[in-house]
């Protein structure tokens, strides 16, 4: 099955249980959780206790995105809380190797996230240590951020780097993803598309998610996580 990763950041945080049920009902296998600290990004969202509660409530794969400063200080806590996949920002730490080693050492999949202005070439020193790359195609924020069309070229560059260096990382895209740009991103090489507002701000989130999953399936997106 094609993989769309619904982002809980766009859901009603007082009704996360219902959001999980909606996701599960569509057959989706992964849910995305954004953790913001108010320093690396202006907003504050959820922490380890919420991730732990989500873990108790669902068997969906928990894809946790740390938008926090010095993430290496907290990766062990989030893996212990139940994160199956954990991504940290290259811009947020001078100790990226350490952060990735800590994640993988705890048994989770290790990813690196890149802000829109950060070039894909910045990952050259850690290509062999990452399980997935999360390319942000909008500036991270609680409010719905505008999709940056120029980011498609970066997705394509990441896909080309994977082929050239014979790497096995999964290519994930997050930020302003909608049914309108899903096809373009898939053709650029995206394996996983993180979708928030386009699902949870719609009139019928379950139907919208199902529709996007069917469209992604037609594009041949990967089901690997």
Please state what every model-predicted region is:
Residues 118-121:
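Alpha-helical scaffolding within the catalytic cores
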Residues 2, 140-141:
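A short, mixed-charge helix-start or loop-turn motif at secondary-structure junctions
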């Amino acid at each position: 099955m094609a993989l769309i990763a619904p982002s809980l950041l766009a859901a009603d945080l007082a009704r996360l249980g219902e959001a999980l049920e909606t996701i599960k009902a569509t057959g989706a296998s992964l849910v995305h959780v954004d953790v913001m600290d108010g320093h690396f990004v202006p907003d504050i969202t959820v922490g380890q206790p919420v991730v732990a509660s989500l873990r108790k409530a669902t068997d969906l794969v928990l894809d946790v995105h740390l938008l926090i400063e010095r993430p290496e200080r907290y990766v062990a806590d989030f893996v212990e809380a139940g994160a199956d996949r954990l991504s940290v920002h290259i811009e947020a730490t001078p100790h990226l190797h350490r952060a990735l080693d800590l994640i993988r050492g705890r048994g989770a999949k290790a990813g690196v996230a890149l802000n829109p202005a950060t070039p894909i070439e910045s990952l050259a020193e850690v290509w062999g240590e990452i399980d997935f790359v999360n390319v942000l195609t909008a500036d991270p924020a609680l409010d719905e951020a505008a999709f940056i069309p120029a980011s498609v070229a970066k997705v394509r560059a990441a896909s080309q780097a994977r082929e050239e260096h014979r790497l096995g990382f999964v290519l994930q895209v997050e930020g302003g993803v909608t049914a309108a740009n899903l096809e373009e991103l898939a053709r650029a090489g995206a394996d996983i598309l993180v979708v928030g507002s386009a699902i949870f701000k719609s009139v019928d989130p379950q139907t919208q998610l199902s529709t996007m999953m069917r469209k992604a399936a037609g594009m041949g997106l990967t089901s690997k996580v």
